[in-house]
UniProtKB/Swiss-Prot annotation:
Protein name: Probable cell division protein WhiA
Alphabetized PANTHER family for the sequence: CELL DIVISION PROTEIN WHIA-RELATED
Leader sequence residues: none
The family this protein is said to belong to: Belongs to the WhiA family.
Gene: whiA
InterPro entries cross-referenced by the UniProt entry: Homing_endonucl, Sporu_reg_WhiA_N_dom, Sporulation_regulator_WhiA, Sporulation_regulator_WhiA_C, WhiA_LAGLIDADG_dom
Role, per record: Involved in cell division and chromosome segregation.
Length: 326
């Protein structure tokens, strides 16, 4: 099953116990998947979804939480439609539901972003908002260079509100416009896993992480297999050895590390087989390989000095024979 379908299937079956979270999820789903229409002088709400289980979930919550009936139409694939779509329509009580969910403000005007009670609420409501947005218009690509969790938004105001909801979950998301369409995107692998966990898609998160790890292992194996030059092999071993020393240095120094040295050390740990030049390019802002090497040397020097003062093993204590055989 594709990752997008797997996440949506799991979220569509996730039980949500609090009424506030269910209300927020419905509000955001209607905002992202639907629209307000005037039919014979009455407001009608429609939401177009790509899964029968999502449509059933939304229909059930509208009835249980807001007390309104709805109609479900199935639009079969054909012509320009590549997949079957499910259209949920609330006609009889459309205006009442629009006001209850915050699609209309107190004066009966359409809300361009998300309702204020969602924008300024708790982390639990932020999770519900993201869950509703993903169920409505979300996608998740396979792990790789272009991996992304993305939500297509109905406008820039809604996109910025979703970015704010991610910030309340301590996650960094970016709003961007591509060919006139507003989107919110997460590209960092750890952030994607964290968001899937917060939303309740635990099985999908484990599958995504497994595929991500498999790809990283395969990429590392391919990289090593292509090391035709012995100097590159020695450089890789030296980088791994430096990573082991840096790990010991961070243990020794604890919190007593200047920020610029800590950044260099973390880069070395996160990219253990990267060259110094590659590490410099990964730094923010980028720096030369000599600058990154100098910072790592100073970090190791500080740690070894402290180890001598304390009479304990220094940064070279974690090196193995394979690492030293350069």
């Amino acid at each position: 099953m594709a990752m997008t379908a797997a996440v949506k299937d799991e979220l569509s079956r996730l039980p949500v116990t609090t009424t506030a979270a269910r209300k927020a999820e419905v509000s955001v789903m209607l905002r992202f998947a639907g629209g307000l229409h005037i039919v014979s002088g009455r407001i009608v709400i429609e939401a177009e979804l790509d899964s029968a289980s999502i449509a059933r979930r939304l229909r059930r919550d509208i009835a249980d939480v807001f007390g309104h009936p709805s109609d479900l139409l199935v639009v079969q694939a054909g012509g320009l439609r590549r997949a079957t779509r499910y259209v949920l329509r609330v006609a009889r009580d459309g205006e009442s539901l629009a006001r209850q969910t915050g699609l209309l403000d107190g004066r009966g005007r359409p809300v361009r972003g998300l309702p204020s009670h969602i924008v300024s609420s708790s982390a639990q409501i932020a999770e519900a908002a993201w869950r509703g947005a993903f169920l409505a218009r979300g996608s998740l690509t396979e792990p790789g260079r272009s991996a992304a969790l993305e939500v297509t938004c109905p406008g820039p105001e809604a996109a910025l509100a979703l970015v704010g909801a991610a910030r309340r979950l301590e996650l960094s998301a970016k709003a961007r416009e591509v060919r006139g369409v507003d989107r919110v995107v997460l590209r960092d692998g750890d952030a994607i896993s964290a968001l899937l966990t917060r939303l309740g898609a635990h099985d999908a998160m484990m599958t995504w992480e497994e595929r991500r790890m498999r790809r990283e292992v395969r990429a590392t194996a391919n990289r090593l297999a292509n090391f035709d030059d012995a100097n590159l092999r020695r450089s890789a071993r030296a980088a791994v050895a430096a990573g082991a020393r840096v790990e010991r240095a961070l243990e020794l120094l604890g919190d007593d590390i200047p920020d610029h040295l800590l950044q260099a050390g973390r880069l070395r740990l996160e990219h253990k087989q990267a060259s110094l030049e590659e590490l410099g390019q990964l730094a923010d802002p980028p720096m030369t390989k000599d600058a990154i090497a100098g910072r790592i040397r100073r970090l190791l020097g500080m740690a070894d000095k402290k180890a001598i003062e304390l009479g304990i093993p220094g940064t070279e204590s974690g090196l193995t024979a394979d690492m030293l055989d350069a």
